[in-house]
Amino acid sequence: MRITILAFTLLVTACTSQIIGTDEHIESYIGSNIADAQKLYLTPHSQAVSFWESRTFAWVETQTPLENGETQHAFKNPYRDCTINWVADQNGMIIAGSHSGEMCSP
């Protein structure tokens, strides 16, 4: 019985440790080209809605030019309250990122 509980605990810990948070995800893209983020967010993918149902969708991008020549790229999830914001310089390199919304955490 103890071995079963230990094995189950190890399995759960191993699986949950693979999930990165939204902040870590954003940090990992700083220094990348905005085209990499666009490819990730604008490519349709399937997400589970319930045990029996899933939806295929892509995030919606809004670009806002900033006064200093940089561009803010906001990627909105159409089904959840989550927006990922990237600021890219004139060369398309991501220099900053943030998120907003109640459902951005994994």
What are these regions (language model features)?
Residues 16-106:
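Residues within mature, well-folded domains
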